[in-house]
Amino acid sequence: MLTAVLAPAAWAADGAGEVQDTAKSALTTGDAAEMQQADAAVTALTGSDEYEQMSREERLTAALAELDELARKGLVRRDSIRTDEENGIVSFTYRCGVLGGILLTLPDELDEMTFDAGDNGLRAPRDIAQCTPRTAEMPLTDDVRQAAEARQYRENALPETIGRAAIYYAFDNTVNSSRFPYYSYMQGFWEGMGLRTTMNTRVTLSDLRRMNKYDLCILSAHGAYYTYSYGTFRKHTRTEPIILLTEASTLYKDIIYGFDLLAHRIIKLNGLYCVTADFFRNAYRSGQLSNTIIYSETCEFLGVTNSVDESMAEALLAGGARTVLGYVNNVYTVYSRSMLWDTVNHLAMGQTIGRALAHAKDTYGENDIIWYTEQGGRRPHAAAAYLVLYGDENARLNVPENFSLEERAEAAEDMLADVLESAA
């Protein structure tokens, strides 16, 4: 039985039972058990039907009441509880020094906020309630259509595999998902283009430590801006981007991940694990991400307007990534997915990541509000989301230089339909 994991952190108690930041060196089984007790109370609240029906103000009141009770029991530090209404998170610190939080906006509501349909002034692109991996479709530009035809007839003697990609899908558990069918479609299409694509729908912290196996890694998950308090004698606050996973915290995992939890490389929101930039910096400190392209769809991956935070990109580049792409601000779902689709399609055609991204922006707009208004949207969100490239804009997949449109002969439309059907 594991009883402790050594790690740098904070530990001490004052006369009132509050824990202050000094030098906790281990996460014990007792610490993990206390966190699980607190997590059980938090998830009982956030997973309840009553919480789902509450207004945001009512959720805040309920969250603060729950944390007050947990502080009374000595499970969380009372002086660490902090409300960030702008980002919709109540943050806190467990008694052992690990960071936690309660989301005031549920994951499915995050989908609604960024879906650009209904109250946002646009209709869904199709009846998503009826959408399945076989009926979801993504639009094809003419050059991608011709590339798919060329590969079908092997007129360019392309290699069987032009690279390996992984979609780290953590938006939801895929059940009745409005998003997942489109990603399943993209996976199948890219496979047909020679990009061997793995779809990971149960993304874990361990998975995010093995991204170096792929040429292209796509982080398809919710993101947030997390603010927390720290310091013993003088309190400070820090805000940083995080990536939310669907991996639930357990006692065993808390012990295994003890180093990262105590070092604040991993935090817990609503009892689920989330990662900070330092998680990637530590996981790939030896530069294992050599030549990998990282494409993040997460909201606020690079912070927000007037507070751009490049820590995620810097950590991945320091870990050896050749190129990192991510968004500033919250991004509309359909715009983000369309940008991903067009960019990867053109990567698979042999373009550099810089050219592929430029094509996507020319097609869908420099930012999501431009796209939104062109679609007839009437009530755009406050700040436009835009995709930024860091690192080498000339990174590319293993596609021959001579893979050009001029070398492709025209193919029958009905044969292309067969390609797309097999991909779907």
Please provide the spans of the model-predicted regions.
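Sec-dependent signal peptide cleavage junction
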Residues: 5-16
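Short Lys/Arg-enriched alpha/beta "domain-start" segment
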Residues: 19-78, 82
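Second-shell loop/turn segments in exported
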Residues: 27-28, 46-57, 168-177, 297-304, ...
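A domain-level signal for caspase-like cysteine endopeptidase catalytic cores
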Residues: 31, 37-49, 62-66, 130-254, ...
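Structured catalytic cores of large enzymes
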Residues: 79-164, 303
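Structural recognition of the beta-strand scaffold that forms the well-ordered cores
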Residues: 165-169, 216-220, 292-297, 323-327
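Cysteine protease catalytic core and zymogen-processing segment of caspase-like enzymes
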Residues: 226-322
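Active-site-proximal C-terminal subdomain of hydrolase catalytic domains
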Residues: 293-423
